[in-house]
Amino acid sequence: LRLARDWAIFIFVCAVIVALMTKGILWLLPKVNAMLAGPQSFDAASYDGTGYSFDADDERFVLVNTNLPFAEEPSPALADADEASGIQLEAEAAAAYQKMAAAAAEDGVALVLTAGYQDADARSAAYETQKQQYLEKGKTEEEAASLAADIQPPAECNDHGTGYAADILSTDYPTRDTGFDTTRAYEWLTAYAAEYGFILRYPQDRQAATGVVFEPWHWRYVGVENALAIRASGLSLEEFLALQKAS
């Protein structure tokens, strides 16, 4: 009887060990396969624009730049886009950003909203700070003003006054510089941001049209259909609007 009991215990222990090993292998296999396959690729869905209808009166197309300053200070209806920081965007844009950030998180990308709507005082302070940095480097007043505007437009020309502009970085790259375009977060945004209504506001090699240097962190809400059409065109917001209004 004792021998039979010992065998029963032995068989039970073996069964437990096998079960645990099987569970461990099943847990580990997907992770090993993912490692062998490499990082997940982010690929934008195709869009032919067949059903796109341009509406020149769409408020989300509000355009501001050094050649087209605000005629009057905007007053967008705001909502919290990020509750932790309290950063706000225009209400529709805020809801879209939250959906986008949640979708990115599901793909292992942690987006960080670092700036949204800014009032005139905040925009003016940002411009003056940038300008002062150039003055301290020995630039003249005129040179400093021009160089600052390429990066941080004056208050009346700053996209952040619309409520639709969002500076987006990631937890692993929290610095606003062009190096952000090497990150997985930028890759994700390039592929999927348009599906949530956001476009890259200042694309590379488009400074002649936008008046601002390449800013991979600066995204602009224009609505899903508009964003998909703009992304498909490969144009900046300025170029897209000019083309649509001319046709």
Predicted regions, residues:
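Extracytoplasmic cell-surface/polysaccharide-interacting catalytic and binding patches
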Residues: R2-S247
